[in-house]
UniProtKB/Swiss-Prot annotation:
Residues 1-27 form the signal peptide. It comes from the Eukaryota. The gene is cyyr1. The chain crosses the membrane at residues 60-80. This is Cysteine and tyrosine-rich protein 1. One of its GO terms (cellular component) is membrane. The keyword Isomerase does not apply. It is found in: Membrane. It comes from Xenopus laevis. Residues 28-59 are extracellular. Keywords: Membrane, Signal, Transmembrane, Transmembrane helix. Residues 81-152 are cytoplasmic. The lineage of its organism: Eukaryota, Metazoa, Chordata, Craniata, Vertebrata.
Amino acid sequence: MDIPRSLRHPEILLVLLLSEITDICQAYCEADCKSYCCDGTPPYCCSYYAYIGNVLSGTAIAGIVFGIVFIMGVIAGIAICICMCMKSSRGTRVGVIRTTHINAISSYPAAPPPYSYEYEMDFPLDLPPPYTPTPPMSHYPSPPPYPGPSRK
């Protein structure tokens, strides 16, 4: 089977493709398309995205960053939910009082000892030292007059 002549020389195919694309991209700068026309000979129409340039790229970057942060938050929320569900399915944590312990305490035969609040009211006196008036300040002489012309 013979290879077609155009595929034997791929550079010819590339040149033909580029010439077709450039013919399509020639600008027809009418009144409604004027803002998207780029300078050149012949003038070519820029795409809307090239026209708005930096605004699009900044917005795109902000959107990508926001999307990544949002997805990370969703993943963290799902992970927390999974961990909480797995934790609640296990037994109680170490150190939590079980019902057998509560029953042992409540079934104690003797009454608890009397409780008094008085020891809480007796606190050591930790007061500041007594008030001592500040010594009178010595009077400083008034400052010298301003060296400029008087205001009179």
